[in-house]
Amino acid sequence: METERVKIRQLQVNEQNPRTCTDKRFEKRVSSVITFPKMLEVRQIVVGEGGVALGGNMRLRALQAIATMTDDEIMRHIEQSAKYKDRPECEREALLRYWQKWKHDPMVSVVRTDNMTEDERREFIIKDNVGFGAWDWDMLANDWDTDE
Protein backbone atom coordinates (compact mmCIF):
# COMPACT_ATOMS: atom_id res chain seq x y z
CA MET A 1 0.00 0.00 0.00
CA GLU A 2 1.24 3.43 -0.88
CA THR A 3 0.64 6.69 0.86
CA GLU A 4 -0.59 9.88 -0.71
CA ARG A 5 -1.23 13.39 0.55
CA VAL A 6 -4.78 14.68 0.38
CA LYS A 7 -6.59 17.77 1.55
CA ILE A 8 -8.35 17.14 4.85
CA ARG A 9 -11.59 18.53 3.43
CA GLN A 10 -11.65 15.48 1.12
CA LEU A 11 -11.80 13.16 4.14
CA GLN A 12 -14.69 12.24 6.39
CA VAL A 13 -14.83 10.98 9.94
CA ASN A 14 -16.34 7.49 10.01
CA GLU A 15 -19.75 7.77 11.67
CA GLN A 16 -19.66 3.98 12.15
CA ASN A 17 -16.46 4.18 14.20
CA PRO A 18 -17.19 2.21 17.39
CA ARG A 19 -14.87 4.44 19.46
CA THR A 20 -15.87 7.53 21.38
CA CYS A 21 -13.77 10.32 22.83
CA THR A 22 -14.60 12.65 25.71
CA ASP A 23 -13.96 16.37 25.28
CA LYS A 24 -11.04 16.17 27.71
CA ARG A 25 -9.40 13.29 25.85
CA PHE A 26 -10.04 14.99 22.53
CA GLU A 27 -8.21 18.10 23.76
CA LYS A 28 -5.30 15.81 24.68
CA ARG A 29 -5.37 14.36 21.17
CA VAL A 30 -5.34 17.85 19.64
CA SER A 31 -2.37 18.82 21.83
CA SER A 32 -0.61 15.59 20.90
CA VAL A 33 -1.01 16.28 17.19
CA ILE A 34 0.04 19.92 17.56
CA THR A 35 3.21 19.10 19.50
CA PHE A 36 4.21 16.04 17.44
CA PRO A 37 3.18 16.59 13.81
CA LYS A 38 5.79 14.11 12.57
CA MET A 39 3.59 11.34 13.93
CA LEU A 40 1.15 12.09 11.12
CA GLU A 41 3.76 10.92 8.61
CA VAL A 42 4.41 7.69 10.50
CA ARG A 43 0.77 6.90 11.44
CA GLN A 44 -1.15 7.82 8.33
CA ILE A 45 -4.90 8.04 8.31
CA VAL A 46 -6.33 4.91 6.70
CA VAL A 47 -9.21 5.65 4.36
CA GLY A 48 -11.79 3.62 2.52
CA GLU A 49 -14.23 4.50 -0.23
CA GLY A 50 -15.24 8.13 -0.44
CA GLY A 51 -12.39 9.23 1.82
CA VAL A 52 -14.05 7.83 4.96
CA ALA A 53 -11.49 7.30 7.72
CA LEU A 54 -11.19 3.69 8.85
CA GLY A 55 -8.19 4.34 11.07
CA GLY A 56 -7.12 7.65 12.54
CA ASN A 57 -10.57 9.15 13.06
CA MET A 58 -9.47 11.06 16.17
CA ARG A 59 -6.36 12.36 14.40
CA LEU A 60 -8.55 13.48 11.51
CA ARG A 61 -10.95 15.21 13.90
CA ALA A 62 -7.97 16.85 15.60
CA LEU A 63 -6.65 18.11 12.26
CA GLN A 64 -10.08 19.44 11.35
CA ALA A 65 -10.13 21.34 14.66
CA ILE A 66 -6.57 22.65 14.21
CA ALA A 67 -7.47 23.94 10.75
CA THR A 68 -9.99 26.32 12.36
CA MET A 69 -7.86 27.40 15.34
CA THR A 70 -6.38 30.83 15.82
CA ASP A 71 -2.64 31.21 16.31
CA ASP A 72 -3.28 32.00 19.98
CA GLU A 73 -5.21 28.75 20.45
CA ILE A 74 -2.43 26.73 18.83
CA MET A 75 0.21 28.49 20.93
CA ARG A 76 -1.81 27.73 24.07
CA HIS A 77 -1.60 24.02 23.26
CA ILE A 78 2.13 24.33 22.63
CA GLU A 79 2.85 26.28 25.82
CA GLN A 80 0.77 23.95 28.00
CA SER A 81 2.42 20.79 26.75
CA ALA A 82 5.00 19.14 28.97
CA LYS A 83 7.17 18.67 25.89
CA TYR A 84 7.43 22.38 25.05
CA LYS A 85 6.87 24.02 28.44
CA ASP A 86 10.58 24.49 29.15
CA ARG A 87 11.83 24.68 25.57
CA PRO A 88 13.23 27.92 24.18
CA GLU A 89 10.72 30.38 22.76
CA CYS A 90 12.27 29.96 19.29
CA GLU A 91 11.24 26.26 19.28
CA ARG A 92 7.67 27.09 20.26
CA GLU A 93 7.53 29.77 17.57
CA ALA A 94 8.94 27.37 14.97
CA LEU A 95 6.18 24.89 15.76
CA LEU A 96 3.57 27.63 15.52
CA ARG A 97 4.99 28.62 12.10
CA TYR A 98 4.69 24.99 10.99
CA TRP A 99 0.97 25.03 11.80
CA GLN A 100 0.44 28.50 10.27
CA LYS A 101 1.90 27.21 7.00
CA TRP A 102 -0.09 23.96 7.23
CA LYS A 103 -3.37 25.86 7.72
CA HIS A 104 -2.92 27.58 4.33
CA ASP A 105 -3.20 24.18 2.61
CA PRO A 106 -4.26 21.58 5.20
CA MET A 107 -3.20 18.17 3.94
CA VAL A 108 -2.42 14.82 5.53
CA SER A 109 -0.87 11.54 4.44
CA VAL A 110 -3.32 8.70 3.94
CA VAL A 111 -3.24 5.03 3.05
CA ARG A 112 -6.12 3.82 0.91
CA THR A 113 -7.71 0.41 1.49
CA ASP A 114 -8.76 -0.16 -2.11
CA ASN A 115 -7.25 -3.66 -2.02
CA MET A 116 -9.16 -4.72 1.13
CA THR A 117 -12.46 -6.53 1.17
CA GLU A 118 -15.35 -5.12 3.21
CA ASP A 119 -14.75 -7.82 5.85
CA GLU A 120 -11.07 -6.84 6.05
CA ARG A 121 -12.02 -3.18 6.44
CA ARG A 122 -14.37 -4.03 9.30
CA GLU A 123 -11.67 -6.15 10.94
CA PHE A 124 -9.21 -3.29 10.55
CA ILE A 125 -11.56 -0.81 12.24
CA ILE A 126 -11.86 -3.09 15.28
CA LYS A 127 -8.16 -3.92 15.52
CA ASP A 128 -6.88 -0.38 14.99
CA ASN A 129 -6.42 0.68 18.60
CA VAL A 130 -6.18 4.38 19.39
CA GLY A 131 -5.36 5.17 23.02
CA PHE A 132 -7.29 8.45 23.33
CA GLY A 133 -10.66 6.96 22.47
CA ALA A 134 -13.03 4.75 24.39
CA TRP A 135 -15.33 2.02 23.15
CA ASP A 136 -18.96 2.78 22.35
CA TRP A 137 -20.26 -0.50 23.78
CA ASP A 138 -23.80 0.01 22.47
CA MET A 139 -22.54 0.45 18.92
CA LEU A 140 -20.27 -2.56 19.26
CA ALA A 141 -23.11 -4.70 20.60
CA ASN A 142 -25.49 -3.59 17.85
CA ASP A 143 -23.22 -3.34 14.83
CA TRP A 144 -20.34 -5.74 15.42
CA ASP A 145 -20.21 -9.49 15.78
CA THR A 146 -18.23 -10.63 18.83
CA ASP A 147 -16.12 -12.86 16.58
CA GLU A 148 -14.98 -9.80 14.63
Q: Where are the language model's segments positioned?
A:
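Short, charged/polar connector segments at secondary-structure boundaries
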Residues: 1-113, 120-148
